[in-house]
Amino acid sequence: MKSVRALIVDDSSVMRKIVERALRQAGIDLTQVFEAGNGAEALGVLQGNGVDLILCDINMPVMDGLEFVKQLSGVEQARGVPVVMITTEGSESHVVQALSCGARGYIRKPFTPDQVKEHVMPLLAANS
């Protein structure tokens, strides 16, 4: 599998590092990791950078993860890039809402590297 450029969007800098570590422990070859603290920051990051994978929280200030995913359709650099939500929101309605907004995966916090691998690897393989 090719090396991956990932964007991790979460309002917690600690959680962004935990997600990055989980990706690496899952065996994903990360060549570049971009970070953003909310959806608006993430849209700014995408304006100048192409990525292969986006992992995003739902509950964030300024612009939440669901609104961010909705707005991705208007960002050329994000077309076709798989988005996986990683969040504490675990209700069925949140999962359905995230998937209907355009997310391709949903992982509940807390999570293990194996769960990240299980959700992310098929998406990366399909996009390679």
What are these regions (language model features)?
Residues E35-L53:
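Acidic, metal-coordinating helix/loop segments flanking the phosphotransfer/catalytic sites
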Residues V84-I86:
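Hydrophobic/aromatic residues positioned on beta-strands within the core alpha/beta folds
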Residues S13-F34:
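Two-component/phosphorelay signaling modules centered on CheY-like receiver
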Residues D11, K109:
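A Lys-centered signature of the CheY-like receiver
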Residues M60:
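Receiver (REC) domain active-site loop signature in two-component systems and cognate sites
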